[in-house]
Amino acid sequence: MTKGKKILAHAVLILASFLSVFPLYYMLCGATNTSIDIVRGKLIPGTYLVENFKSLVANQNLGLAMANSFRNAILMTLITLLVCSIAGYGFEIYHDKAKDSLMSVLLLAMMLPFVAIMIPLFKMMSHWGLVNSWAAFVLPSISTPFMIMLFRQASRSFPNDIIEAARLDGLSELGIFFRMFVPIMRSTYGAAMTVTFMNAWNSYLWPKIVFQSNASITMPMLVANLKSGYSVDYGMLMLGVLICTLPTAIIFLCLQKSFANGITGAVK
């Protein structure tokens, strides 16, 4: 690579980094300033963080929203990883005549937008009496086609010789999965956990539909409630967005290596 191309590449990377970091910096500045300072375009962190936090706690049930969001995200992550990893493993390891047909159905399901099945899903949840429960939030997403495809792709690198040796030693199929497949596929589980947790935490439309009581409020719903029809406290709103963003940012930073390895198909 010539010197000019290196300079151009670094310039593009610097610009991309700035465009990625600036919204976070602006959000941090907004969380520490008053609404007047934000409207005036102040780009220096202020001293109103505590005041904005007191206003947020006084106007919204922050603790309840955080607890509900963590509960929903953790439950969805655990159940989705279990179901999708077993399904992906089964699609690749076991051979059956109906496997190709089922895979075609799975691929077709990936093409359906959520809004196309949202009303039927809500009617099902209402018929089963699950509205306003965590089950209504978790059940429609436990068999995500993308996650099944991810684990199926990862299963292709799982050596068949190990499976046959384990069977000869008398290990059950569930034993092979939990004692051999799961430890080897740590990177894939890390990537799947990151994506699932972030999707569950940031979900707004479906929780807004199935959670119809104030006791079931989540963090995205709380942030939406900070905007009234007549006035907006931008400092409090920015702080709410910042608090809502922190858990997913921490999860991604902790699992970024596993995320990269899992998405690219690395097995360690």
Regions found by a protein language model. Name each.
Residues 1-3:
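Short, Lys/Arg-rich, polar N-terminal cytosolic tail immediately upstream
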Residues 5-268:
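A structural signal for multi-pass alpha-helical bundles of membrane permease subunits
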